[in-house]
Amino acid sequence: MSRPEKALGAWVAGIRESFEEVGMLIALMRDGSPVTIRTEEERRRFCGYRRALNRGEMKFSEMLEKEDLVLPVDRLHYFSHWITPEPLPLRYDVRFFVAAAPADQAVIHDGVELTEHLWLRPSAALEEYEKGRIGMVLPQIMTLVDISRFRTVEEAVTAAERRHVPAILTKIRRIGDADVEVMPDGTAYERRPPVYSWPKKG
């Protein structure tokens, strides 16, 4: 990303959305120690912040200031950048990061954007998708394919630190009787191509 302020905003947004959607906060105390959400009082306090953020009653910066926290943006590593095909009525411009999950924090989905969760290795998540047990779009699929090459979090982080991240603009391609999201060169994820369902008119 060419503009520093835009780049920093993407990193901050990644940390904020992880907290808002699953309750995982990548942040440090002023002394450099990681924030913990371990005790009953800590869970109650940070759950309250999270509810206020999701309701629009508080800004993320206000929570950080109140708790005197700093964001270790250097612990998020830029991994991939995806843009939806131009013909689609709903488009996204999304960036994926890799990071080690903070210790002493329990993942709790927000019940709105995320209604359930489970921990899976990347290869296991792809297998669940291929069996039709979970849904994914192409950016999720291909990012998991890429990240499944690594045996550990440390390997993924090291690779991301050295990585050049181009923007990938996907396409819609007609395959059989389905519209499928494919890579820019037209190749599809053959094991189970992600079918795009157009919104119904009227």
What does each model-found stretch correspond to?
Residues 1-72, 97:
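The catalytic Nudix box helix
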Residues 62-69, 73-82, 91-104, 109-134:
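NUDIX/MutT-family hydrolases
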Residues 2-10, 48, 85, 89, ...:
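Conserved aromatic-histidine-acidic binding/catalytic patches
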Residues 34-35, 88, 106-107:
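Short catalytic/ligand-binding loop motif for oxyanion handling, primarily in non-cytosolic enzymes
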Residues 30-31, 81, 140:
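Short, well-ordered beta-to-alpha junction loops that form the rim of enzyme active sites
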Residues 43-44, 57, 117-153, 157-162:
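Internal, well-folded beta-alpha domain core
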Residues 138-202:
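Core RNA-modification/binding signature centered on pseudouridine synthases
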